[in-house]
C-alpha cells in the first residue's frame, strides 16, 4: 500500500483556496496550512508516502500524482527510483523532536534467492507494534529497480526466516522518516557506525532536484556504489 498526499491549495496556491465552493470548509488559509502539516506528520513513517505539492499548475499536480501512482503500481511492473547518500551521523535529538519525523525500528533478513534477484523480509515498527513485508528486487539500472512487495502475517514472516541466506547477517537499523519541503527522506542509523549514516529518497523522476535540510550534512552520493547497499552491509566477511 501507499499514501499519496495532495498538499492543500493553502500552501503554494493560496489564490485558489476558497471556502465559497465547499460548505464543509471553514478554515482560513493559515488554519488549512497548519492542518495539512499535521496530516503529513500523521502519515510520516509509512513505508511509501508521496507528497504532491503545488509547484506548478493544477493540471501538472494531477500529472505528477498519476506519475507517482504509475511508478508505485508499475507499468508493467512496480519499480522504485531511489537516490542514496552517505551523510554525517545525524543529530538524533533534532530528528526525534521534529514533528515531521517518525522513528521506526527495522530488522531485515535476506533470503536465499535466484541469480539477479534480491529477496528479503522485514519486521518494521516501534514499541512492540510491528508489520511484516517480503520484498523482491531486480536491478534495472544504478538508480532504478523493479520492486515487488507484499505484506506478511507474523506466521508467514517467521516461516520465511527459515530460508535465510546464511552468508548474510541480519541488518538491524533505526530509520528516521522525515518530510521536508514536500520530500520524504528515510535516514538509516546503524549500530555499527558512529560517524555516518545513510539517507535515501524515492521519486518518480530520476531528474528530480533534491533539497536537504541544513541539519543533514551530505558526505557524498552513493546511489551507484553497491558497497553501501544493505545487502552488502549484511555480507559476512571471511
For each feature predicted by the language model, list its residue ranges:
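NTP-dependent small-molecule kinase module
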Residues: 22-24, 31-86
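Short, exposed beta-strand "edge-strand" segments with a Pro/Gly-rich flavor and a Y/T-containing core
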Residues: 20-27, 54, 144-152
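Phosphate-end processing signature that detects enzymes handling 5′-triphosphorylated RNA
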Residues: 59-60, 66-238
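A generic structural signal for ordered alpha-helices
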Residues: 17, 21, 39-47, 138, ...
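A structural signal for short, well-ordered beta-strand segments and their strand-loop junctions
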Residues: 3-5, 51-53, 200
